[in-house]
Amino acid sequence: MSDSDDSNFSEEESEHSSEAEEAEEAEAEEERASAAGSEKEEVEEEEEEEYDEEEEEEDDDRPAKKPRHGGFILDEADVDDEYEDEDQWEDGAEDILEKEEIEASNIDNVVLDEDRSGARRLQNLWRDQREEELGEYYMKKYAKSSVGETVYGGSDELSDDITQQQLLPGVKDPNLWTVKCKIGEERATAIALMRKFIAYQFTDTPLQIKSVVAPEHVKGYIYVEAYKQTHVKQAIEGVGNLRMGYWNQQMVPIKEMTDVLKVVKEVTNLKPKSWVRLKRGIYKDDIAQVDYVEPSQNQISLKMIPRIDFDRIKARMSLKDWFAKRKKFKRPPQRLFDAEKIRSLGGDVASDGDFLIFEGNRYSRKGFLFKSFAMSAVITEGVKPTLSELEKFEDQPEGIDLEVVTESTGKEREHNFQPGDNVEVCEGELINLQGKILSVDGNKITIMPKHEDLKDMLEFPAQELRKYFKMGDHVKVIAGRFEGDTGLIVRVEENFVILFSDLTMHELKVLPRDLQLCSETASGVDVGGQHEWGELVQLDPQTVGVIVRLERETFQVLNMYGKVVTVRHQAVTRKKDNRFAVALDSEQNNIHVKDIVKVIDGPHSGREGEIRHLFRGFAFLHCKKLVENGGMFVCKTRHLVLAGGSKPRDVTNFTVGSFAPMSPRISSPMHPSGAGQRGGFGGGGMSRGRGRRDNDLIGQTVRISQGPYKGYIGVVKDATESTARVELHSTCQTISVDRQRLTTVGSRRPGGMTSTYGRTPMYGSQTPMYGSGSRTPMYGSQTPLHDGSRTPHYGSQTPLHDGSRTPAQSGAWDPNNPNTPSRADEDFEYGFDDEPTPSPQGYGGTPNPQTPGYPDPSSPQVTQPYNPQTPGTPAMYNTDQFSPYAVPSPQGSYQPSPSPQSYHQVAPSPVGYQNTHSPASYHPTPSPMAYQASPSPSPVGYSPMTPGAPSPGGYNPHTPGSGIEQSSSDWVTTDIQVKVRDTYLDSQAVGQTGVIRSVTGGMCSVYLKDSEKVVSISSEHLEPVTPTKSNKVKVILGEDREATGILLSIDGEDGIVRMDLDEQLKILNLRFLGKLLEA
């Protein structure tokens, strides 16, 4: 017997033997196989190849059978030759074997024998490791088991697919018919058909339809389920919304019927940095930011603000009442993780790279909690964090996307592109390509590319485009925190745009997609239209503030204490209009809204601004040079001084006698509380609260010499004694200008113009200028200094009778014409210790000279300069001489200067009376109605006699003291170097050099270098330090006062100065210059 016969015999015998003999036969077979050697293996391989070829031929001849159990087995059988599938079969072989052993006991003997033989063959195959045989075995075995299950009832459960197939509609089921319906009435129509069906249900002609479907996504159609079309027509007959579809109904194909009712579950596609809220637990309703998503594990990692119960940690560490407190649940507040505090309470905080570990939770270095949650534990739809929540997550909330849109399957992403926007491609092959949007159609954007090789329009999805801007673009914020604001782009970063707000002058950091090119400027009105920027609002019954920033949900309000607070729109109420509010500054001047003031004390000392609002003792000012809070700041009114006067106010808003000033000094015809009550022409005459028209000035060409329109030339269209309406040549704009700021073109006079009505007299020897009120003389000293019954500055005589004439109706030298400015009505406004007045004379007699408002001039003076006498005056009353004529005040009585617009102090100096100031001397800071060129100093050392009126030739002689004396305070200004004169009482300070820090009235705050201290010295005890060549100088007198420059050279008493403002060279008298402190 050959070896091959022996092997065949062993195989046949092993197939009919019991399981107990299989192991012994296998061992014997292994021994014989090892003895046979390689010859046996070659013979077996040849036989196996022949066997395989025969089986393949039989398989080709055999017709293919249709599988009864789905396509899974055939798919695996078709790709059986691939190596990867064989590995998969090997991995599952043991599971199949166990399954067969379990099921073997439940089938008949035939199947049991086949399975046993198959198990033995599987063992042999595993032992010999023949891959082809293993693949063939699994293919046959798996297919056989499936057939066995189907034939012998091994599994009664069908797959889900087959189960769903049984539910599909067939030809015997009712059909769906589409019926055209009125758009927007689909649901109401379906309900109407249901009611009609119920109404006809128990009648002789019930409706034959089965159902009505009105899907949300289908507009203009409804679906009616019925067997026949006639049944549909019967049901919809008489329904108004279905009238258009009565004659035409279309049947839905059977294959498409399931799509009508198919509901697609929206799978939330969460992305990092999006926002969610927690549903339950200790973090219920808390906002959280997505860190990363694990869809395979259905988990999401969130960044959130932790809630750590420090009391629980403290109690647990102390073991005191721990078990009692453990049962009490108290939701701890949100607070960032503080490792130091945890350690101080005894907690154990570990470090793991960039995170801190406490009680199994991970915390970032900034204190945020990073924790994983199940997808079902969070709310993802419609989550919009509030502004306060955003501020907790990031210092600059604008960096976070406020309008979080959770994208869903089948839902287009929202965008805000508009035609005309500049965009660039951010995804795809054409990335970084720039272009301009031509049209927008839903989610499709058509652009014209900015490329030399691309001339045709291109279409992109919205998500592939983003807006781009360049520096200098003027844009408007269309979404986000600063919605509605406009500004200029100053910087463009990678994901942000920095723009400078037009309204608040703040830098705003905004996302590019929230911007849009625009040319207009923000109106400064909030979204509701109830509040605007700069408006006075009330925060509580005792606190007011001004809106300095408008945001989408909140306001930033500068309150009366200088603090900027953030409040919601509903928390503020609009304050009552206070345009007519009046307050007093540090020098008891009347200040109103729109007045220009200077701050002399407090944190904003040195600033100038316009009053926007007055409330009690606080003033809200606006300064164009201040960037913070849009130029708005607040200070107390006692820290202000009226600087440059106020803007023209509409005098028609003030009724006659509506305001009685509290200060006894403030009473002039400008405020008609005085003369208006006299009811006649007395007290200054014809003071009615409005000016008389001046026809002489109308039509003349003038130049504006002061103010924001300095240098402009125009034609006077209308004029009163105080203001003029000027049409500018350059801009064709008509503006109101104070007459003191006007100069007639071609006139040789360098100073401002003078009203013919004598409201403010010309320089030299006339009634005192603005700020003196109705008192004459100015500053409490008279000319001559002694015996005040003499005629001082021509105009201090106030006759008690015949007070109804003015210079406009009679000559200036008329002895019967009293030309003194109006005095106050109320007697108590003058001191009771005024100079006594002799008894009045009858008509035609000598007028009664009277000088109200100042104490007895016999009081000792600090200095006694030369006192000129009035020539040719015989003795009168207390004097050696008297004048037979009442010397009038030329041009001086239509309306004297308005007191509230004075800048300097009128009350006598607290350190003693000062020397005589000429009424025409230059004042420190006159009102806008009093800006005049500085008078030239007297060419001689003595003061000439004072005539009664300007000479016809235009020469204007000076009064005593009108020269530039160092004792006057009109030259005083800040930052210049001064020297303390010998007249100062403190001998230690005499002769020292200092710098003027601030000026209040006639008092100067001077920093002395030698003694290194700040002292308050009256201006009469100071003299300016004369500058030398190359010194930094400041103009202290003249029309260029307060201007700075460099002294280039000196020529006698004049100096050549290069001005800092316009780089022009000017020749100025050295007396007009003060030396600035060297840096």
Swiss-Prot record:
InterPro entries: KOW, KOW_Spt5_1, KOW_Spt5_2, KOW_Spt5_3, KOW_Spt5_4, KOW_Spt5_5, KOW_Spt5_6, NGN-domain
PTM comment text: Phosphorylated. Phosphorylation by P-TEFb (CDK9) at Thr residues of the C-terminal repeats alleviates transcriptional pausing and promotes transcription elongation. Phosphorylation may also stimulate interaction with PIN1. Bulk phosphorylation occurs predominantly in mitosis.
UniProt GO cellular component terms: DSIF complex
Keywords, comma-separated and alphabetical: Activator, Nucleus, Phosphoprotein, Repeat, Repressor, Transcription, Transcription regulation
Gene Ontology biological process terms from the UniProt entry: regulation of DNA-templated transcription elongation; regulation of transcription by RNA polymerase II; transcription elongation by RNA polymerase II; transcription elongation-coupled chromatin remodeling
Biased composition (Polar residues): 753-784, 859-882
Residues recorded with modification Phosphothreonine: T767, T776
Pfam families per record: KOW, KOW1_SPT5, KOW2_Spt5, KOW4_SPT5, KOW5_SPT5, KOW6_SPT5, KOW7_SPT5, KOWx_SPT5
Composition bias type Pro residues, residue spans: 849-858
Stretches the record annotates as Interaction with RNA polymerase II: 310-417
Transcription keyword on record: yes
Subcellular location(s) per record: Nucleus
Bias (Low complexity): 888-903
SMART domains according to UniProt: CTD, KOW, NGN
Sequence segments annotated as region (9 X 7 AA approximate tandem repeats of G-S-[QR]-T-P-X-[YQ], motif CTR1): 746-809
Cited function: Component of the DRB sensitivity-inducing factor complex (DSIF complex), which regulates mRNA processing and transcription elongation by RNA polymerase II. DSIF positively regulates mRNA capping by stimulating the mRNA guanylyltransferase activity of RNGTT/CAP1A. DSIF also acts cooperatively with the negative elongation factor complex (NELF complex) to enhance transcriptional pausing at sites proximal to the promoter. Transcriptional pausing may facilitate the assembly of an elongation competent RNA polymerase II complex.
Protein name: Transcription elongation factor SPT5
Gene source species: Gallus gallus
The organism's taxonomic lineage, starting at the top: Eukaryota, Metazoa, Chordata, Craniata, Vertebrata
